[in-house]
Structures are given as structure tokens and as C-alpha cells.
């Protein structure tokens, strides 16, 4: 298990746990006074998904998103400078616009990996007039779903606690769950 203490900041927690639902939950607990948290990251069997991309603007460029998202994100890519590859400027947000990245230049390859998210953006520019591919104010938006644990994933993590020698107060399972999972957890503890 990874140990997170109450004196760790957001940056240190994210270094340990990444941009994950577990990190989000741990930060909430630390913010509310938890002094020590033992974390058992679980590789979810069901991978995260990416929604359809919606475009705002009338330029000729396009964007797709690929990868295995590691959390639920509300992504907004907004163009702040006109052009094509290696000239257009953009910002991105992974929290629905609450915060934005610094402005960056659209890479020469047309591909940009959003750091720490597991998502890669692939842009296509207009072949005949690349300088008209993206206009100021163009935006591409989409959401992702976090990876999902199966009942077996949760039960395997709980099984590891039986060999854990530290004293702890409770178990917090992070992520979506179903009544069937809780029935399986209850049965495993009997």
C-alpha cells in the first residue's frame, strides 16, 4: 500500500497516485482532516472511454481523441490563434473550463498528449489551405469516463488487506459500485 499523510500537498499526492479517482478521493480526505491514508491502487478491468467530440466553429480542421483515460474528464480544447500545424495556438482544460493550460502551439505532427490523462488528441488540417484549418474561438469538447472496477477487482484489493499489518479504521472503495459488488464484499467478509 501507498501511504499518504495529511501534510502532503496536491502535487505530491498526484505524483504518487496520478490523475485518478483515487487521488481525487484522497485529496478530499486530506482536505477534511485525515492524517494518514493507506492506498491500494487497483487496476480496473474495464477501461475508461471517450465520448464523441463536438466542434464549435466553422473552420475546416478536425480533431479526434484516442487512448485509455484514467479518470473522468470534461475536456475543452480552444483555439486562441489561427493557423494549422506548427502555427495555430490553443489551450485545453480537463475540468470543464474551471482551469486552463498555458497557451501552446499545435504540434507539427498534429498530435498532442494531454499530460497525465491517458488521452491523445489527433488534429487534421485542411490539405489545400492549412492556414485556414483552425480559427480563433474554435473549440472541441468531449468527456471521458474513468476506468471501472469489477467485483473481482474490488475483492482482490480487499483480500490484500488481510495481510496488511497496520491498524486502520475503515475501507473506502473509490469509484462506481453496484449492490451486487457490496453483496460480494459482505459475503467475502463472512
Segments the model singles out, each with a brief description of its role:
Residues 1-190:
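Surface-exposed assembly/interface segments
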Amino acid at each position: 500500500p501507498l501511504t499518504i499523510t495529511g501534510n502532503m500537498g496536491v502535487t505530491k499526492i498526484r505524483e504518487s497516485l496520478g490523475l485518478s479517482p483515487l487521488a481525487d478521493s484522497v485529496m478530499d480526505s486530506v482536505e477534511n482532516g485525515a492524517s494518514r491514508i493507506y492506498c491500494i491502487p487497483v487496476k480496473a478491468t474495464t477501461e475508461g472511454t471517450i465520448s464523441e467530440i463536438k466542434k464549435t466553429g466553422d473552420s475546416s480542421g478536425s480533431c479526434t481523441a484516442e487512448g485509455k483515460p484514467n479518470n473522468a474528464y470534461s475536456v475543452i480544447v480552444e483555439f486562441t490563434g489561427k493557423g494549422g500545424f506548427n502555427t495555430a495556438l490553443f489551450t485545453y482544460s480537463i475540468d470543464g473550463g474551471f482551469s486552463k493550460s498555458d497557451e501552446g502551439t499545435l504540434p507539427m505532427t498534429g498530435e498532442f498528449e494531454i499530460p497525465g490523462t491517458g488521452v491523445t488528441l489527433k488534429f487534421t488540417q485542411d490539405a489545400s489551405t492549412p492556414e485556414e484549418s483552425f480559427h480563433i474561438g474554435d473549440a472541441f469538447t468531449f468527456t471521458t469516463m474513468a476506468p471501472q472496477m469489477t467485483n473481482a477487482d474490488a475483492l482482490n484489493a480487499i483480500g490484500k488487506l488481510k495481510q496488511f499489518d497496520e491498524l486502520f479504521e475503515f475501507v473506502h472503495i473509490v469509484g462506481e459500485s453496484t449492490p451486487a459488488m457490496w453483496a460480494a464484499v459482505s459475503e467475502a467478509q463472512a
